[in-house]
Every structure is written in C-alpha cells, then in structure tokens.
C-alpha cells in the first residue's frame, strides 16, 4: 500500500478505502428477536403464500353477485371470523356475515363493507354498487411462495423482521458483527466524572464514536485512553490489531503529533493516506495493520465525528455486508444565512434545514463552525456541503445539503 502525500479529496479517499476492503463472510444463525440491526447473510425465500387464503379486507358481508342482482334483502346464513371460518352450507339467496381477516367462504365473489348495508326485518339490504372481487385479499397477493422477500445484505429492522415472522420463519443467518477496537490518545484527556488537571479536557470523542459504532451494530472493544508514549501506543495498536477487524484511534494524527504514530503504523502495517482536503477533518489517516484496517480520526470533536460519519461509516457498512447506503441523498436548497468559506477544501458546515413561510425548503447555519464546537450537531439537522473551490456564500444562493441520518437523530 503506497503512502499518498498531499491533500486527498473526500471522494478519492472513500473510493480508496472501499476498494480495499471485502465484506466479512463469517455468519451465525439467530432468532428474529436478536436480529435487529443485523445484516442478512442469505436471501429470505418465502415458504408460503401471504396471505395463505382469500380473506376479507373489511367487516361486512360475503356475497355472490347473482344473489344481490334483484336488490332484495338477503338473510344471513352464517358468520366467518378470523381464526373461525364458516364451513356450513351457503344457500342461494343468502349472505355470510364476515370480519376483517376471516377466510371468505367458497363461492364468495365480493365483500360489502357494513357501512354500505342496512339491516331489515327480512335480512340485509345492500345500498351501494357491488363489484366483483371488492374487499377480498387474494391468496399470495402480498408475497407468493418461492419469492425472494429480502436479499442477502439487507439490514434487518422493524420493517423487515415482522414480515419474516409472518412467513413462519423463526431464525435467520446473519453476518457476524464487525469487531472494532477503539481508543483515544493524549495526555490532555481525562475521563468524564474525574477532576480535570491543568490543561486537561474530557474525552468526548471516544464516547461519540462508541455510540455510533453501537448504532451501526458493531462489536466495540473499548481500550480507553492511551497516553502520549510511543511504547504505550505501540502496545495499544498490537492489542487492538489482535482482536479487531477495524482499529479506530482518536487524536495523534495532526501535524506535530503524528511523527511517532506514523512511525509505529509503518512498522506494524502500511499507511494509504494521511491528510484530506475537507473541513473539518483534514488530519484523517487510513491504512492496514497485520490483521485489521486502521482509521485515525482527528482530535477535534467535530472533525472526528465528521470523518467517522463520511468515511468510517461506509467502510463499516461494506465490511458488514450491508448493501444499502447509510448516507441520505443530498439536495439543493437556498441558504437563508451568509456562510463564511475559504476556497481550498470541501467544507461540511452544520445547518438547520426547514421550510420557510412560503413552504419552501431553506437552510440556515447553526452559527460558529469551529471544529471544537460539538453542540453544532445537536443544534443542526444537516450538513451544508460547500464545494472545494467555493468562497463565501451570500443569502439566497443555492447550496447542497445532506440531512443527518439516524446516527445524529435524523432520517
């Protein structure tokens, strides 16, 4: 793996990362209740038709068209309930009382909802036109036996798992979780809940990354804070590499910090690239250790979170076998705020996407965009993506926005 100098574009960096990794193949079979957020290892094929029988879409009356042609009231010959179908005789000139989900009796040509009927002394009168097949759910209408319901690579959520259960399937094979070893570096870091020493700050990056990893369904190996010592850092990399598919560090990759980090990484593996043409997030490193992939996040909180979101998230998705993109589609809107920008790097500013008084989408800035201001994520709901060569943006100009996904409480 050749080390690339200079500033690499985001697209080039992401393509470089994704081109090198291959999805995990190890799998395990789990009951559905344990499969939320997991990735299907093989297609789910339906063993049966859904629904498995013709049934009523409404509470009402099952009828034959010939019986209602005269317009006369029809006596009720029986009742059909969900789980208790009607099996008795169905004489000509009568109807069957039927409930939603109940099997329609043999010979039924339509179900008339009860709101379109009138109870008479001598039976039920139908007050609206009746069409053949109305309000009948046909067997296999939703899913037919033998159909691929969900392909391998699908991330399982509450949208998919109940469907699988409706097929009578109790467990499915899923790709094993991606194992990620995580640590922060720096003498200045302190654990939340502990008193701060002179010049110290609390370690927030590791918490943010840990939470995002759990949301993505990873198995997290949290190695804590590693002090600014080459021997300790080398030992941490060796331990992490022995346990994980991906090693993520926070801090230690900026200019002035990176000398011994780079030396250790080159000793233990290879570095693909070190610096990106994005803001925030310029000091991001990617490479390969003996057994795992390495992602070095910047120390500034916004920079660390942004590079994880834009680069590490897609990498983990590919490793896990997830075939869907985790990033919402970008869209063009007008800005209602003036945006400060210096040409030279792709800029991800935090913004608020909302509709104005005319019902049109527009975006406003969350305020100061410093790479240390993590509150911009809680205030915003999108990134304002400003092109590399673009300068300051005036009110009313068109910009590209990318709504936050579920990692930040978005889509």
Curated annotation (Swiss-Prot):
<dbReference type="Pfam" id="PF03453">
    <property type="entry name" value="MoeA_N"/>
</dbReference>
<protein>
    <recommendedName>
        <fullName>Molybdopterin molybdenumtransferase</fullName>
        <ecNumber>2.10.1.1</ecNumber>
    </recommendedName>
</protein>
<keyword id="KW-0460">Magnesium</keyword>
<comment type="subunit">
    <text>Homodimer. Interacts with MobA, MogA and MobB in vivo.</text>
</comment>
<dbReference type="GO" id="GO:0042802">
    <property type="term" value="F:identical protein binding"/>
</dbReference>
<dbReference type="GO" id="GO:0005829">
    <property type="term" value="C:cytosol"/>
</dbReference>
<dbReference type="InterPro" id="IPR036688">
    <property type="entry name" value="MoeA_C_domain_IV_sf"/>
</dbReference>
<keyword id="KW-0500">Molybdenum</keyword>
<dbReference type="GO" id="GO:0005737">
    <property type="term" value="C:cytoplasm"/>
</dbReference>
<comment type="function">
    <text>Catalyzes the insertion of molybdate into adenylated molybdopterin with the concomitant release of AMP.</text>
</comment>
<dbReference type="InterPro" id="IPR036425">
    <property type="entry name" value="MoaB/Mog-like_dom_sf"/>
</dbReference>
<dbReference type="InterPro" id="IPR036135">
    <property type="entry name" value="MoeA_linker/N_sf"/>
</dbReference>
<keyword id="KW-0479">Metal-binding</keyword>
<dbReference type="GO" id="GO:0046872">
    <property type="term" value="F:metal ion binding"/>
</dbReference>
<keyword id="KW-0501">Molybdenum cofactor biosynthesis</keyword>
<dbReference type="Pfam" id="PF00994">
    <property type="entry name" value="MoCF_biosynth"/>
</dbReference>
<comment type="pathway">
    <text>Cofactor biosynthesis; molybdopterin biosynthesis.</text>
</comment>
<comment type="similarity">
    <text>Belongs to the MoeA family.</text>
</comment>
<dbReference type="Pfam" id="PF03454">
    <property type="entry name" value="MoeA_C"/>
</dbReference>
<dbReference type="GO" id="GO:0042803">
    <property type="term" value="F:protein homodimerization activity"/>
</dbReference>
<dbReference type="InterPro" id="IPR005110">
    <property type="entry name" value="MoeA_linker/N"/>
</dbReference>
<keyword id="KW-0808">Transferase</keyword>
<dbReference type="InterPro" id="IPR001453">
    <property type="entry name" value="MoaB/Mog_dom"/>
</dbReference>
<dbReference type="InterPro" id="IPR008284">
    <property type="entry name" value="MoCF_biosynth_CS"/>
</dbReference>
<dbReference type="InterPro" id="IPR038987">
    <property type="entry name" value="MoeA-like"/>
</dbReference>
<dbReference type="GO" id="GO:0006777">
    <property type="term" value="P:Mo-molybdopterin cofactor biosynthetic process"/>
</dbReference>
<dbReference type="InterPro" id="IPR005111">
    <property type="entry name" value="MoeA_C_domain_IV"/>
</dbReference>
<dbReference type="GO" id="GO:0061599">
    <property type="term" value="F:molybdopterin molybdotransferase activity"/>
</dbReference>
């Amino acid at each position: 793996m050749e080390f690339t100098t200079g500033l690499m574009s985001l697209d080039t960096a992401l393509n470089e990362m994704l081109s090198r990794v291959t999805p995990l193949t190890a799998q395990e079979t789990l009951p559905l209740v344990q499969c939320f957020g997991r990735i299907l290892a093989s297609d789910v094929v339906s063993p049966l038709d859904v629904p498995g029988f013709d049934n009523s879409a409404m509470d009402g009356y099952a009828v034959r068209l010939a019986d209602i042609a005269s317009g006369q009231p029809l006596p009720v010959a029986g009742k059909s309930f969900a789980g208790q179908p009607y099996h008795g005789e169905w004489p000509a000139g009568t109807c069957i009382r039927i409930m939603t989900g109940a099997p329609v009796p043999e010979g039924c040509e339509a179900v008339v909802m009860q709101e379109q009927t009138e109870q008479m002394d001598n039976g039920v009168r139908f007050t609206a036109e009746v069409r053949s097949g109305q309000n009948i759910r046909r067997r296999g209408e939703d899913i037919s036996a033998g159909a691929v319901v969900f392909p391998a690579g699908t991330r399982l959520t509450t949208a998919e798992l109940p469907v699988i259960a409706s097929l009578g399937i109790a467990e499915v094979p899923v790709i094993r979780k991606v194992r990620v070893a995580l640590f922060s570096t720096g003498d200045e870091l302190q654990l939340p809940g502990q008193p701060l020493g002179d010049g110290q700050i609390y370690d927030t990056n590791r918490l943010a990354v840990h939470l995002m990893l759990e949301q993505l369904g990873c198995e997290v190996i949290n190695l804590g804070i590693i002090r600014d010592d080459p021997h300790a850092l080398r030992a941490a990399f060796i331990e992490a590499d022995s346990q994980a598919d991906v090693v993520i560090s926070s801090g230690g990759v900026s200019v002035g910090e990176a000398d011994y980090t780079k030396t250790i990484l080159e000793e233990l593996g290879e570095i693909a690239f070190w610096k990106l043409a994005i803001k925030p997030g310029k000091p991001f490193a990617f490479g390969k250790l003996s057994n795992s992939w390495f992602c070095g996040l910047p120390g500034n909180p916004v920079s660390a979170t942004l590079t994880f979101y834009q680069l590490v998230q897609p990498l983990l998705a590919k490793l896990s076998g997830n075939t869907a993109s985790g990033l919402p589609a970008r869209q063009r809107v007008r800005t209602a705020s003036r945006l400060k920008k210096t040409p030279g790097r792709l800029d991800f500013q935090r913004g608020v996407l909302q509709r104005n008084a005319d019902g049109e989408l527009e975006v406003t800035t969350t305020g100061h965009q410093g790479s240390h201001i993590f509150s911009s994520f809680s205030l915003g709901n999108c990134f304002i993506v400003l092109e590399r060569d673009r300068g300051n943006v005036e009110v009313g100009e068109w910009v590209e926005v990318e709504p936050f996904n579920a990692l930040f409480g978005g889509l």
